[in-house]
Amino acid sequence: MSQPIVMAPNATGSGHNMRALALTRELHTLDPTQEIVVLLGSMQDVFEPLFSSAGAKVISTETGVVDHAKSGHLDKILDREHFVDGYLAPTFLNGSKMIDYLAYFDEIDPAVVVSDYNLTASAAAIMGGYRHVLVTERYDFSLVQLSNEDFREAGFVVNETEINRVRPALTRIFDWLIRNSALVLTDKPPLADLDADTALYPHLSEANIKFVGPMTRPTPENVDHDQVRRELGLGSGPLLVASVGGTTMFMENKQKAIQTYRDAFAHLREDHPDAEMVLIGRGTPDVDDEGVRTLDYVPDWMPLLTCSSALIAQPGWITVTEIAALGVRTIFVLGGRGEYHELEALRRLDALGFPTAIEPTSEALHALMEEAVTGRLADRCAKALTALAPSGERATEAAAGLIAQVVR
């Protein structure tokens, strides 16, 4: 019997689970006899059945259901104590969890460990002598690609001496992970202006480092838009889908984004009374605004997105890759600069040509909504979508094929 593939998605966001799920499905399609084990650290109630239906065995690494979207994660002090010891190390370089992962690997004896930006699992695999594949939307730790001034503008108190000392150390760690990986796959197109000083960028010319494009689930075909709308109780007018994302650094930023969406949409309804908005966000309370429908979480939102005039979303990278595979016009919004983990992504999307906004006023967001419902966003987004998905479609099959080669 062949050794299993272990999938180890980062527990911090549903996007890592979703990308690992897409790869799991494709790996199972390539070889239904290949055993796949998923070490699942978050949203077990949603993703355990999804991974099981994809042909994988699921092991929860936690004693209960974990959901990082329902609380904030940072203080406004950027120093060794609060940021490194209080957040970065326990979240991304956790010694206790490293021991747990090594124990799992010893029990499972995998042919390869596929880490979806789970850097703790990556380090454990490398130290344990297991073949390792890193799937990443990041070219380095987020802290490395942001300046102290970026954090100050977001309201952080920055200890420059301590943080400046941390950055090069983090890049060395990320570089070590890359150099000790059999394969590195990324779905983020490189931009020299943003990436030149990162750990991954100098390695992009190496044979085992690949920008592949969107690693997403299959895109739906022949969607019955009328049926999708009926199931959600929607009419036939212009439809906006607005998402407030998953993991947040500060809950007030998520709440501020929701209020801005609502105010901008209320303004839009004055000229487009048949317009509707589906507001999606884990833990989002119901609202009774005219034309607004709230949903907590939609495991498969692709059919809904194909019905929309545009998506309004935070720049979580799995969202970015899914809209690229679908060709959906998208407005990317950051509710607050304190969401530092998404600031680099927003800058990249802006450079590629997408409409973007940081802490927009309701008037500014309304103007973009108006462009969406009148069809004026299509040309603006077309070139940017091509940069994200050069082949014009998802790259999951190609990525799974590369992983399968490592197994062989």
Q: What function would you assign to each model-found segment?
A:
Residues 8-9, 19, 187-191, 212-272, ...:
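Active-site donor-nucleotide binding/catalytic segment of nucleotide-sugar enzymes
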Residues 16-28:
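Short amphipathic alpha-helix
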Residues 74-114, 119-120, 160-165:
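Conserved nucleotide-sugar donor-binding subdomain of glycosyltransferases
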Residues 99-100, 278-284, 289-319:
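Donor nucleotide-activated moiety binding/catalytic core segment of transferases
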Residues 112-116, 299-344:
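A donor-sugar binding/catalytic signature common to diverse glycosyltransferases
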Residues 131-217:
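Active-site-proximal region of nucleotide-activated glycan assembly enzymes
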Residues 373-408:
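C-terminal amphipathic helix plus adjacent low-complexity
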